[in-house]
Amino acid sequence: LAHTLPNYGVTTTFVDPSDLSNFEKAIQENTKAVFIETLGNPNSNIIDIEAVSEIAHRHKIPLIIDNTFGTPYLIRPIEHGADIVVHSATKFIGGHGSSLGGVIVDSGKFDWVASGKFPQLTEPDPSYHGVRFVDAAGPAAYVTRIRATLLRDTGATISPFNAFILLQGLETLSLRVERHVENALKVVNFLNNHPKVKKVNHPSLSDHPDHALYQRYFPNGAGSIFTFEVKGGQAVSYTHLRPHE
């Protein structure tokens, strides 16, 4: 977002998501979408999805959510107002670090015509004999154009074998993530009570600033990614880390 996409003419306005008014302030006339994560990397911070969805839709732009850390087992963003959901399938969906891949899920709910900001979907496409994707594909216009043009032009597709491997991982996603959460909570609680640990960042803890959102959006747990700070800072951390290089 910060360094690669600007080379293709796409710029990003970054905001502090802890204050929802920042989203409202950042939206400009040429803003095409709001992009957030269900669980932030690396502190697993949580954003009020429904509130951000309302802001995006008021400005007639879609809400795109990266649900890589959340996974479909823990949260389904479309049920909370997301229009498009993306995943890095390499992480929890695949589960074994064996393949590179990604997923795009189109809710089919966003009105691309009413938005007036997406001529690629509403105007004739000369590379497909003048087809208008909103007419040819209806609610699936967005994801259809991705498959018909962007996949064709960029080659951003995985091999059949890698797709097969990712599907094998998908079959056990719920079982694996359930265990991930169970194990993570044990470690989080252990570290949170450790005398040499200054702070643990995980929304399951009652003192985490997003704990209320955790209870609202993540009844099955908020993933297994967390960070912690040790007393003594960097010097103490390096003392323990360097012997294990």
Stretch-by-stretch model annotation:
Residues 105, 227-229:
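Short hydrophobic/aromatic beta-strand micro-patches
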Residues 233-238:
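Short, conserved charged micro-motifs
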Residues 239, 243-245:
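Conserved small/polar residues in nucleotide/adenosyl-binding loops
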